[in-house]
Curated annotation (Swiss-Prot):
The gene is cyaY. It comes from Neisseria meningitidis serogroup B (strain ATCC BAA-335 / MC58). This is Iron-sulfur cluster assembly protein CyaY. One of its GO terms (cellular component) is cytoplasm. Keywords: Iron, Metal-binding. It holds the Pfam family Frataxin_Cyay. Belongs to the frataxin family. GO terms for molecular function: ferric iron binding. SUPFAM superfamilies: Frataxin/Nqo15-like (SSF55387). PANTHER family: FRATAXIN (PTHR16821), FRATAXIN, MITOCHONDRIAL (PTHR16821:SF2). Disulfide bonds: none annotated.
Length: 107
């Protein structure tokens, strides 16, 4: 398990990476980071929320498709419920919100 400061650094790097990937690829999303929350808004107003839950050292995604909790396991963020990869869930949510294929590369 990471220390709290390691978790915060890792999650901040992940949030920055997501924003950079969206900007570099020109996808139609607006990103806002405030506190522990990265809000990604599609052109039609659909939102995907990515936040960190420091006490549990989890990343959470909230989207129209549902809510997901991810814990770090062997260098990957995997869903606590079904083991799905963070990037797979995020890319599906972003693709559904934008109507185009979105592929955020792993950090």
């Amino acid at each position: 398990m990471m220390t709290e400061s390691e978790f915060i650094r890792a999650s901040e790097a992940l949030f920055e990476h997501i924003e950079d990937q969206i900007d570099e690829n020109g996808w139609d999303f607006d990103c806002r980071f405030a506190g522990n929350v990265l809000t990604i808004e599609a052109g039609d107003g659909a939102q995907i929320i990515v936040n960190r839950h420091t006490p549990n050292q989890e990343l959470w995604i909230a989207a129209k498709s549902g809510g997901y909790h991810f814990a770090e396991q062997n260098g990957k963020w995997l869903a606590t419920r079904d083991g799905r990869d963070f990037y797979d869930v995020l890319n599906e949510a972003l693709s559904a919100a934008s109507g185009e294929a979105v592929e955020i590369a792993e950090l």
